[in-house]
A protein has these predicted regions:
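N-terminal Rossmann-like FAD-binding beta1-loop-alpha1 element of flavoenzymes
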Residues: 30-57
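Extreme N-terminal leader/targeting segments of oxidoreductases
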Residues: 1-32, 50
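Central helical "cap/lid" subdomain
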Residues: 224-258
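Central beta-strand plus flanking loop segment that forms part of the substrate or channel wall
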Residues: 75, 79-80, 127-129, 250-258
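Conserved N-terminal glycine-rich FAD pyrophosphate-binding loop of Rossmann-like flavoproteins
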Residues: 61-98
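Redox-cofactor binding/interface segments in oxidoreductases and associated redox assembly factors
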Residues: 35, 77, 236-237
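Rossmann-like flavin
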Residues: 86-196
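Helical element adjacent to the flavin cofactor pocket in flavoenzyme catalytic cores
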Residues: 145-146, 170-232, 237
Length: 258
């Protein structure tokens, strides 16, 4: 059902400029073909193209139609399982490496954005983790102290009496602020990745679904809605939009609660 005056696209997409001109003719052969034009696909394409390999990115919809431009834009150091839980399963050394990936990811995005000069509203605003009960507040403070002492993740506690300076609300029982966490405009970030890809001579085509990938003696034959492409290598970057096109990957993609 369509309602008058209601748009089905996120309102923050209105802050984007005109979509850059994309590829309209499918090349017959490329070094690298990337399936999916979200953050993962474009990031991979930027690297392969800058490395001198002809690169084509295909998407079944508009580039960035999915979660890459529709997420909340929070960038944190969070890896869900605690160091204690990971240590019990993998041992302390591997657990620390897994947890460190969260910190590395935050720093990488910040450094990449600054180095490349991306216009995507990246800001170091911090993240407030709210307590729902007084007991929850004590737990959050204790866990934050462990993160600081064991993993050098900076934070500070905000008791309920000082909460309004962070939220302007008395709805919670205090909380903890992780001061290094950032926010970003997700659609602008994607648009800037698209700009970098096009600048590196990546060919990007939307509304060109890949229907079959077959291995050949020289690489892969990729069948699409608009023709066939020969590729030396194929990168599947479809994440949550993975289909039976790649059943092995489809079986390994699972939803994770936010």
């Amino acid at each position: 059902m369509t309602l008058p005056g209601i748009t089905q696209s996120p309102y923050w997409h209105e802050q984007l400029g005109e979509t850059p001109e994309l590829c309209t003719t499918l090349p017959g052969q490329v070094d690298v073909l990337v399936v999916g034009s979200g953050y993962t696909g474009l990031s991979a394409a930027i690297q392969t193209a800058r490395g001198g390999r002809t690169t084509l990115v295909l998407d079944s919809d508009d580039p960035g139609f999915g979660c890459s431009t529709r997420n909340g834009g929070q960038i944190s150091t969070s890896v869900k399982p605690s160091l204690e839980k990971l240590s019990a399963k993998f041992g302390p050394e591997k657990a620390r490496r897994i947890r460190a990936e969260g910190v590395n990811a935050l720093h990488w995005v910040r450094n990449f954005t600054e180095t490349e000069g991306l216009d995507c509203d990246l800001r170091r605003v911090g993240r407030f983790h709210a307590a729902h009960t007084p007991q929850h507040y004590e737990t959050l403070v204790r866990e934050a102290e462990q993160l600081r002492s064991q993993e050098n993740i900076e934070s500070f506690a905000v008791p309920r009496s000082e909460q309004r300076r962070e939220l302007g609300s008395d709805a919670y029982f205090g909380g903890v602020v992780f001061s290094d966490h950032c926010s970003i405009h997700p659609a602008k970030f994607h648009r800037e990745l698209l700009r970098l890809a096009l600048t590196a001579d990546v060919e990007v085509m939307g509304h060109c679904a890949v229907t079959r990938i077959e291995r050949t003696s020289s690489g892969f034959e990729v069948n699409t809605a608009k023709g066939v492409v020969q590729a030396r290598d194929v990168i599947v970057a479809t994440n949550g939009y993975t289909t039976a096109l790649t059943p092995w990957l489809q079986r390994r993609v699972i939803p994770i609660g936010s």
